[in-house]
């Protein structure tokens, strides 16, 4: 079989104007970026009828280093729906350069179910991440500049500038810097070293752009006005009296919004079969809320009958955050959940196999092993029950691999129905495109006709502590929460300041339902340690770090960039 990049280059493509014309998008509301991608004006959202399409939310079992094919299934299902005569658009997140050059690689799907051109999808796209990085770092630079000038001018600051002093506490600055790259050396650093003109010396850190609060804001904003208001609410630091200092008070919110004006517009692209895809925003699901944008979903729902969107990692991660954060803020409601499962992924979740990065895969992973698969299906059952908890029907998509036996596929299908899925179907979208996902598409159409009513895990009025406890006990199946002294103090402060009404976004490992990646399958009787709690006032949630979570990843010993190059004709090679 050809490589992903070879399939991408050989796939027939529509010029972006023709793709937009298919969707009845007026030419003046499309802003082309080259031949095969273009921004969609926010005016389009205003001109569309009330959204009448049905949203299908794609999640998965607990992911493994092998990959379960969630993006492949998301794109393949959308193609499959079009294949059976049900108009569909996919909405997915933009890839971060960090994983592209790290271990994971790109996020454009794969095989015959990918976004094309895949090079453009994975590398820069329309520059949204760079714009967001610039806007984020503008706030950081403005904060340090204000700190410097207030200290330099002292009591003369207000008289000389006409500005009120902010009295920034250099030891209580909340806003890091950001970069769209995996770079562990930037996790802890000291800035302002040198002479007096080089700024105030203090500790600082970087987060990856996908973990910036600005990325969450971009994904959750409903329009330009909402974006501007959310940015103004961002808490950048605290003053010497312990009071918050916002981007509005620093007078930088307007300029930050200007930098994000184009980034607020979704990017229209296409799959290998010319199915339309809206690509927008890119918050990670382990260290952010892990879903594509509200604006892209609303546009797509006004343009077509079925919208297939992807939530990051397993149902304990992106799916939970879709319902408890994105749905809660936007009102966007899935008609159906699709859970992606693989035979090899469930074997890996059995806890019986020793799978290590860089080591040969266990033999039983690549040959028929029904007992190991049977044990691993407990993880599938947990995720089905977890998804059903939110009140919508669940279909299991069995993403087929060449090493799967018919007996294993049949066992997995039986386990899905036994655990409460309303249907299951094998998907071969990777090798067959939309035709390989037609059975899955039919199961999804049937599921979308079933009645459903969304149920959230906790009410708005519950305390932040109660929300955390509910997430651990109901969302992860744990026994309770272990708060560090720091987290306990932070929760008390946030409660006293009136932030209890916000939802909670837990940052944790995606490799286990629990906080511990070593706990495979369906762990029980565990407590989740919460090390730190942070307010994201602009995004509209409280961010809790479960264990030693890194918001700036690092490159591994065998990074993907080693294989990426360009030939004499300007063709990129080695990108996956």
Curated annotation (Swiss-Prot):
Superkingdom of origin: Bacteria
Q: Where does ATP bind?
A: 64-71
Which pathway features in its UniProt record? One-carbon metabolism; tetrahydrofolate interconversion
Keyword annotations for this protein, in alphabetical order, are: ATP-binding, Ligase, Nucleotide-binding, One-carbon metabolism
SUPFAM superfamilies xrefs? P-loop containing nucleoside triphosphate hydrolases
Give the EC number(s) under which this enzyme is classified: 6.3.4.3
Among Pfam families, the record links this protein to: FTHFS
GO annotation (BP), single = tetrahydrofolate interconversion
The catalytic activity, as recorded, is:
(6S)-5,6,7,8-tetrahydrofolate + formate + ATP = (6R)-10-formyltetrahydrofolate + ADP + phosphate
- GO MF annotations for this entry? ATP binding; formate-tetrahydrofolate ligase activity
Q: List, alphabetically, the InterPro entries matched.
A: Formate_THF_ligase, Formate_THF_ligase_CS, P-loop_NTPase
User: Does ATP-binding appear among the keywords?
Assistant: yes
Family (UniProt): Belongs to the formate--tetrahydrofolate ligase family.
Q: What is this protein called?
A: Formate--tetrahydrofolate ligase
């Amino acid at each position: 079989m050809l490589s992903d990049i070879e399939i991408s280059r050989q796939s027939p493509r529509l010029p972006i104007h023709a793709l937009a014309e298919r969707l009845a998008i007026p030419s003046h509301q499309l802003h082309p970026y080259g031949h095969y991608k273009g921004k969609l004006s926010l005016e389009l959202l205003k001109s569309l009828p009330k959204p009448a399409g049905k949203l299908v939310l794609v999640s998965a079992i607990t992911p493994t280093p092998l990959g379960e094919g969630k993006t492949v299934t998301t794109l393949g299902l959308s193609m499959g729906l079009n294949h059976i005569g049900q108009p569909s658009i996919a909405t997915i997140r933009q890839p971060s350069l960090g994983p592209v050059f790290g271990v994971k690689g790109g996020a454009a799907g794969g095989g015959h179910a990918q976004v094309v051109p895949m090079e453009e999808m994975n590398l820069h796209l329309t520059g949204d991440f760079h714009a967001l990085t610039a806007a984020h770092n503008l706030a950081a630079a403005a904060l340090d500049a204000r700190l410097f000038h207030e200290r330099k001018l002292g009591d003369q600051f207000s008289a000389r500038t006409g500005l009120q002093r902010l009295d920034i506490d250099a030891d209580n600055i909340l806003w890091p810097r950001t970069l769209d790259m995996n770079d562990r050396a930037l996790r802890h650093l000291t800035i302002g070293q040198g002479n007096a003109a080089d700024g105030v010396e203090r500790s600082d850190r970087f987060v990856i752009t996908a973990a910036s609060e600005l990325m969450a804001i971009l994904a959750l904003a409903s329009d330009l006005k909402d974006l501007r208001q959310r940015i103004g609410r961002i808490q950048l630091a605290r003053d010497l009296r312990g009071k918050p200092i916002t981007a509005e008070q620093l007078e930088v919110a307007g300029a930050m919004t200007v930098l994000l004006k184009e980034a607020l517009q979704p990017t229209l692209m296409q799959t290998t079969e010319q199915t339309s895809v809206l690509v927008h925003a890119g918050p990670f699901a382990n260290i952010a809320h892990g879903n594509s944008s509200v604006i892209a979903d609303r546009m797509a729902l006004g343009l077509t009958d079925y919208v297939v969107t992807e939530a990051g990692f397993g149902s304990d991660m992106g799916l939970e955050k879709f319902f408890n954060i994105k749905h809660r803020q936007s009102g966007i409601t899935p008609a159906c959940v699709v859970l992606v499962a693989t035979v090899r992924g469930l074997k890996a979740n059995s806890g019986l196999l020793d799978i290590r990065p860089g080591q040969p895969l266990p033999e039983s992973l690549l040959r028929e092993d029904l007992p190991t698969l049977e044990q691993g299906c407990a993880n599938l059952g947990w995720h089905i029950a977890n998804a059903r908890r939110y009140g919508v029907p669940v279909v299991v998509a069995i993403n087929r691999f060449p090493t799967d036996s018919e007996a294993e596929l049949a066992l997995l299908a039986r386990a899905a129905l036994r655990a409460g899925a309303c249907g299951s179907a094998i998907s071969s979208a990777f090798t067959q495109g939309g035709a390989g996902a037609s059975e899955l598409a039919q199961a999804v159409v049937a599921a979308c006709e079933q009645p459903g009513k969304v149920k959230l895990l906790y009410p708005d009025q519950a305390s932040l502590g109660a929300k955390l406890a509910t997430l651990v006990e109901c969302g992860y199946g744990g026994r309770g929460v272990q708060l560090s002294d720091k987290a306990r103090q932070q929760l008390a402060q946030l409660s006293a300041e009136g932030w209890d009404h916000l939802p909670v976004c837990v940052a944790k490992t995606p490799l286990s339902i629990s906080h511990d990646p070593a706990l495979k399958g369906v762990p029980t009787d565990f407590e989740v340690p919460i090390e730190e709690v942070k307010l994201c006032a602009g995004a509209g949630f409280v961010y809790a770090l479960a264990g030693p979570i890194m918001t700036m990843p690092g490159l591994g010993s065998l990074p993907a960039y080693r294989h990426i190059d360009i030939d004499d004709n300007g063709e990129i090679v080695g990108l996956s």
